């Protein structure tokens, strides 16, 4: 999945408005940001393989308290697209915060996919969890996070009712206590009403399940339009930047702590996540 039509439109406008973006510099930054897609995917794949190897080793040779195991599902925002470094993605920052709070080893499997829709989660990511023994299998799963819907909002053939039906089936497959987020604001884009409708459906589905809601939509609606457009987003004007992902991670950490009836960890105070990957990608984009 390449650069979105929306991103090209915004970057093109930026190139014509040098006073805002330095002309063609905006398009150059956009292209560099898009290179994250492959880099981050490969880094997460490498990390996941190393994590699975660690789980197998522990299964064969248990050593003390088992690690706290997190699985993250969803789309490119879960991959960390837009963050300057993959370790600044919200799953990595959340995992680091939980590890610091619990003083315990935390293992993170990120099964998300850039461009994913709710159909992708139901038909690809959930079966992948089953195949890896994470659902009704040998591994004890402690937490699942799910962020999905942004691509569904943009897909004209995805009816909101169909989105909700698939989401409810996904939630029924997940262990209790999953953290599920609403869809961030689409600002002045014409799809904003669909984003609101689908977010409302996410909230309703979560309320009928054993999951917990993480309200990213309310967070993003608090920003003024200029701040949301230029300070919150990365160069593609679609994905959050590193600072915004820190706020996402804090909301997830807050929901996690509330579900456990304990004080929430401070995400900004947690150390950088130590990924089990020799391919920890760092984009050239400097936000």
What are these regions (language model features)?
Residues 1-71, 259-287:
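N-terminal secretory targeting modules
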Residues 47-66, 122-140, 168-172:
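Short amphipathic alpha-helices and their capping/turn segments at secondary-structure boundaries
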Residues 69-71, 79-162:
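Conserved SGNH/GDSL esterase-like catalytic core that processes O-acyl groups on lipids
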Residues 102, 174, 208-209:
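Helix C-cap/helix->beta junction micro-motif
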Residues 107-109, 177, 210-212:
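Conserved beta-strand segments of alpha/beta enzyme cores
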Residues 119-130, 161-168, 172, 246, ...:
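Amphipathic, non-transmembrane alpha-helical secondary structure
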Residues 147-151, 170-199, 217-221:
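Active-site segments of SGNH/GDSL-like serine hydrolases
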Residues 188-287:
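Catalytic His-Asp segment of secreted/periplasmic serine-dependent ester chemistry enzymes
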